[in-house]
Design a protein with these regions (language model features):
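A short acidic, often aromatic-flanked loop/helix-cap motif at beta-alpha or helix-coil junctions
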Residues: 45-48, 100-102, 124, 181-182
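Short coil/turn connectors at secondary-structure junctions
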Residues: 8-10, 34-36, 60-64, 87-91, ...
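Residue-level signal for inorganic ion chemistry
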Residues: 55, 70, 107, 113, ...
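Conserved N-terminal catalytic core of the sugar/cofactor nucleotidyltransferase
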Residues: 1-68, 72-79, 187, 229, ...
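Short, amphipathic C-terminal "tail helix"
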Residues: 221-222, 227-250
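Catalytic-core segments of class I nucleotidyltransferases/pyrophosphorylases
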Residues: 65, 85, 114-214, 218, ...
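Conserved donor-nucleotide/metal-binding helix-loop-beta segment in metal-dependent transferases, i.e.
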Residues: 75-103
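Hydrophobic packing residues within well-ordered alpha-helices of enzyme cores
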Residues: 23-27, 145, 194, 243
């Protein structure tokens, strides 16, 4: 849904050999979301930056957005950021304040807002701004990833990719404001926090968070017929009932 809301419709999903068919069965080829989905496999864990090597042919000469599957963004106005990034040479990363920056990639700034440092999970962070799992790059990211050395953790680090763009003075950063909610749902505790927030927010607003059919419908990529089909497929669930209500007000 996050990608669709940014206007991105050509999407590659990278998963393990054991799970890729689960995603394919769940999401299909993407037409019911007004998108085209491609499925790629990661043979073994090799770091976030390995994604660019796996999808090098998918990227081709295009700009690319990389979104980590356990990152949840709410109220971020990412469509505006995506539009700017797509027209910009180099790379765009986000920055958000966090209480435990040592667990993430950390970015620090000068008083003028220029990037001062980029570090991967530092023991003594220079700032409380961390880099969440949503990145925008031009097509040269594939070449940058190909030249990366394997880190001490045995991985191709995304922070090293960003370092290369920064050294070439082609790295841009957008600090997310206080109205933004971001969750890293990579642990049971963090997943619980995210689920609790989403539940409360949905009860308050009456709107689902993470409904790709709704995002596609509001973009004009699918019509009433596709919405009706998805509602029928999920008619016995709360999700299906939500789509039916959406159709009634469409």
């Amino acid at each position: 849904t996050t990608l669709l809301e940014m206007g991105i419709r050509d999407i590659a999903i990278i998963a393990t050999e054991k799970t890729v068919d689960i995603y394919r069965k769940l999401l299909g080829e993407g037409s019911r979301f007004g998108a085209a989905l491609t499925y790629l496999t990661q043979p073994e864990p090799g770091g976030v930056a390995q994604a660019f090597l796996i999808e090098r042919h998918f990227i081709g000469e295009d700009h690319v957005c990389l979104l980590l599957g356990d990152n949840i963004f709410i109220n971020t106005h990412l469509d505006l950021i995506s539009s700017v990034a797509a027209a910009t040479e180099g790379a765009y990363i986000l920055a958000v304040r966090h209480g435990k920056p040592e667990q993430y990639g950390v970015v620090s700034f000068t008083r003028g807002g220029r990037i001062l440092s980029l570090e991967e999970k530092p023991q003594k962070p220079r700032s409380r701004y961390i880099v969440p799992g949503l990145y925008f790059y031009d097509a040269s990211v594939v070449g940058a990833a190909e030249k990366l050395p394997v880190s001490a953790r045995g991985e191709l680090e995304i922070t090293d990719v960003n370092q290369r763009y920064w050294q070439d003075e082609k790295l841009h950063v957008f600090r997310l404001g206080r109205g933004t909610r971001w969750f890293d749902a990579g642990s049971p505790e963090d997943l619980f926090k995210a689920a609790r927030y989403v539940r409360n927010r949905q009860k308050q607003t009456g709107k689902l968070i993470g409904c790709p059919e709704e995002a596609a419908y509001r973009k004009g990529w699918i019509g009433w017929r596709e919405l009706e089909w998805s509602a029928g497929q999920n008619r016995h669930s709360l999700y299906g009932k939500y789509l039916i209500r959406l159709m009634e007000y469409a």
